[in-house]
Amino acid sequence: MPNAVIDIPAASAPEAEAHFAASFRFETDCWDVHDTLSRPDAGFVLLDVRGPDLFAKGHVPGAINLPHGKIIASRLAAWPADTVFVTYCAGPHCNGAARGALRLARLSRPVKIMTGGVTGWIDEGFVLDSGQPGA
């Protein structure tokens, strides 16, 4: 009987290791972002790539609002070229974080996505900020 889970064989252990190890170069999670933001120098810039209205309703504390469609070289000039950016959007149902990350990568900027976005942040029990910091 066909089985959607195992009809396609699992990757070999070395292939799986390489795949999952590489994934950490592209993404981080809400817990790690929260933990790192509690330190004096987080070492990255957190970008909320949603629109300003959604940002104003609630965003991750310390995030800067820069909608993914407005990520251009001149908006990034304030940060050194080796600055790591972490993008997030509404959640797993939203591709805004990937759109923002793609724009940053095309501008030769190091970037990761915060998986889960706002939904993941809330699911972890973290609080959103409704202040108005911005770029």
Residue ranges, per PLM feature:
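Flexible, polar/low-complexity N-terminal or interdomain linker segments that lie immediately upstream
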Residues: 1-57, 132-135
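Short amphipathic alpha-helix with an adjacent loop that forms part of the alpha/beta core around
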Residues: 37, 72-81, 135
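Short active-site oxyanion
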Residues: 40-46, 61-62, 84, 110
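Hydrophobic/basic alpha-helical segments enriched in Actinobacteria
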Residues: 42-43, 71, 82-83, 119, ...
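Short loop/helix-cap segments at secondary-structure boundaries that form the rim of catalytic
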Residues: 55-61, 121
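Short hydrophobic/aromatic-enriched beta-strand-loop microsegments
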Residues: 63-70, 108-114
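Short, hinge-like loop/turn segments at secondary-structure boundaries
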Residues: 64, 82, 128-132
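Catalytic cysteine-centered active loop of the rhodanese-like fold, especially the PTP/DSP P-loop
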Residues: 76-122
